[in-house]
């Protein structure tokens, strides 16, 4: 059974991101467009809570149900919400095109109801040596976010 989800991002960065998963255990395809980004890499994460009552800050930390360190999307030791970076050319829109095998739209670890956050700076993928590298990727301010909701199949 295919599951689809959508996230409308608001803030200084704005856009729409779609999620699609063919069945439990298969990769999730993440696609969409974001505007309002400076040229360069921007951290792109799923955060724990679907709460935007205080803007992006109330979305909590990266979604990390297994207590792992922050890492790159290809790392075994990473938060489930660590989706790496999206690259802005300086022109609108910035395309989002990610396939990830760790996030899911099924079961207890589903990202549906959680928040996508776009950050001001590049995610160092846990390799930067900064005190925040192993928790946030030192990706800077939260400049856009939105709650992931169920979409029509």
Curated annotation (Swiss-Prot):
Principal location listed in the UniProt entry: cytoplasm
Keywords: Antioxidant, Copper, Cytoplasm, Disulfide bond, Metal-binding, Oxidoreductase, Phosphoprotein, Zinc
Residues annotated for Zn(2+) binding in this entry: 62, 70, 79, 82
Keyword Transcription regulation: no
Residues that, per the record, bind Cu cation: 45, 47, 62, 119
Biological processes annotated in GO: determination of adult lifespan; positive regulation of mitophagy; regulation of synaptic plasticity; removal of superoxide radicals; response to oxidative stress
Catalysed reaction, written as an equation: 2 superoxide + 2 H(+) = H2O2 + O2
Gene3D superfamilies: Superoxide dismutase, copper/zinc binding domain (2.60.40.200)
GO molecular function terms noted in the UniProt entry: copper ion binding; protein homodimerization activity; superoxide dismutase activity
Disulfide feature: 56-145
Phosphothreonine: modified positions: 53
GO cellular component labels: cytoplasm; mitochondrial intermembrane space; peroxisome
Pfam families, per database record: Sod_Cu
Cofactor annotation: Cu cation; Zn(2+)
Family: Belongs to the Cu-Zn superoxide dismutase family.
Subunit structure as annotated in this protein's UniProt entry: Homodimer.
Name of this chain's protein: Superoxide dismutase [Cu-Zn]
Gene source species: Drosophila melanogaster (Fruit fly)
